[in-house]
Amino acid sequence: MLAGKPFRIAIAAVCAVMAIPATATAAVAGTSSFGLLRTIAVTNLRSGGWGSLRAAINTVNAGPPGLSWTIQFRVSGIITLTTSLPPVRRPTKIDAMSATGYSGRPLVELNCNGKAGLRFAAGSAGSQLLGLAVDNARGNGVTLDASKITLNGNYIGLDLLGRRAGNSGDGVYVSSTSSRNLIGLNPAAAVGVVSNVISGNGEDGLVLYGSSGNTVVSNRIGTNRGGSARIGNGGAGILITRWSDNNEIGGTAFVDKSTGQANNPTGDKGTVTPVFVVPPLGNLVSGNRSDGIVIAGHSTGNVLNGNFVGTTADGNSALGNGGNGVWIFDASNNSLIGCKFVNNPFVYYNVVSGNRGNGLTVQDSNNVVVQGNFFGSAANNSSVVPNRLNGILVEGTSANTQVGGVIPLGNVSAGNGANGIEVTDEAHGFITFNTFGGLHAFGGAAPNGNDGVLITSTGGDNLVRTNVMSGNTHNGIELAGDATGVTVDPNISGLTTKGNAILPNGGDGLLIDGNAHGNTIGGTLRSVIPQNTFSGNKRYGVEITGWAHNNLVYRSYIGTEILGRTALGNSLGGVLISGGAYLNAIGNFTHRPSNLISGNTGRGVTLLSGTRLNRVVNNYIGRNRFGLPLPNTGIPVLNLGHLNLILANRT
């Protein structure tokens, strides 16, 4: 055996050739160890016999444990099985990219013809499946029972022409004995790379069942290769369940080809226009019959980075999943993270738009983090791709859902059929922070069909902080049902992001109705928004109605621009208290003035008959923040209710 000199062993009964280059590597105990590369060539498209893929796998499996193999293809075309292939039981690189003429799309198809799909069994850890179309299997197209397996460049559920040829089960199934796999590959973090296309299968596209530490990047799941047409899987696009932990769907890397710089922010916060970048490691998960991505079954620590869910590949048109875009159910400590650059206006996002259910549903799940995402907005930040229901729904007993963060970790939830955000049932510890609800990020109106945010939850300890809720069909913010324990401070509702021009909601800036009680509007939280500003709306700045009671409104501007100097009035008046509302307070004696209610078309404050025991105290009504006249067009206060207290207001 000569160092550096390959030699060949012909094995006529099994395959065309096995090439074994032997290279001296190191002397150990007076001998030499050699790195051995075992390559088998597939030379025909038959289901079995000499030169077939079946014969190659049988040879691999007959080898001693610990050896690695490569199966190359000297042919292209369709292998139609007559019986199921044996599982792969040794580390094997099945390299259909080696087929002559390969240029980025599969040239070899494994038509399972109703037989079992391809399975990587125990003993095959470290295997690779490259550039193969796997279709028409009974059950799953590809099953991973071993770890550290790479899938790249494959069609799973499509034929060589990219047409539906679905496997009857899941496209790719990763079992609890398999972990740390690469489903998709894009090491250069290059824009436009399509790794695997997993579409047209009878059940889910990709299932992680008790599997952890996997990375899923640059795949098309539920669409054609171009990401322009639906070839949906029969279930979800991706299902992560049964204690599947710490999987990353997508990624945050980005390389600017013009500079070669990775993750290149555009400058310091506030000095450069935000840049919106299509995330190259993200997956397109669209067109599936059920939900786009499901995280369930106590799975934890999973992260979605930079995926487009429910849109075409460019993120600007709908190619919706039949259910929710993302559904997190009974699975805590998971996250959708679009952006990690806190100090730069580099905006990097998941786009979860165009779906037939909600964009995101968080149900009975705790500590979910949602930062830097678009729900209902297109990737271009200038048009809408509506989710049919809410942008975000938080329900059940979900605790501590964090939607947003410091700039630029906020979200856009705009253009959706119902609400931008809805929080219901007993959800508690919820926060929306730096959300654009009803408008594009730093831009114009993109109305949600109902409210910017609707909270009916009885769970308490929910916070609406530093949001712009403007441009919605109905209200900017609504607290309804038995909502309690909600703090709203500080926000803009009815104006643009800078708070200096009108961007009206079709209803009220803030509506408190139903039996909502014990909520606080205003406070001492400060950020780029100095206080609540409810101005420019087509009805009232603040309306309290129904049987709402024990709600406090203070430290808010109602009818002015954000600095409280000039008028940007609400169309019907500043504050309306109606129905049977009781024991509510517009103002208190902690701050002077408590509220600024000025510049509105209509009366400053109206209390209709049927209301009782409400207080309007210590406010500027018809004056700006400096105490100078800024009148409402009607009288300062009209009180038609019973035992309402009007006291110490400056008019």
Predicted regions and their residues:
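Bacterial N-terminal signal peptides that target proteins for export
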Residues: M1-I11
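Bacterial N-terminal signal peptides
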Residues: I11-P21
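N-terminal, post-signal-peptide segments of secreted/periplasmic proteins
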Residues: A26-S147, N152, L158-G169, Y173, ...
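Extracellular beta-strand-rich solenoid/capping regions of secreted or surface-exposed proteins
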Residues: N58, T80-K93, L107-Q128, D135-K148, ...
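Beta-solenoid repeat scaffold
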Residues: T82-E109, T150-G157, L161, N181-G192, ...
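Parallel beta-helix/beta-solenoid
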Residues: R89-R90, G123-S124, L129, A146-S147, ...
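Consensus positions within tandem repeat domains that build extended binding/scaffold surfaces
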Residues: D170, E203-D204, A236, S290-D291, ...
